[in-house]
């Protein structure tokens, strides 16, 4: 999941 700051949370 690309979130607001730019990254992945899995």
UniProtKB/Swiss-Prot annotation:
Predominant cellular place of this UniProt entry's protein: secreted
Cellular location(s): Secreted, Cell wall
Any single GO CC term annotated in Swiss-Prot or TrEMBL for this entry: extracellular region
Entry keyword set: Cell wall, Secreted
Protein name, entry field: 50 kDa cell wall protein
Organism: Nicotiana tabacum
């Amino acid at each position: 999941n690309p979130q607001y700051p730019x990254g992945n949370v899995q």
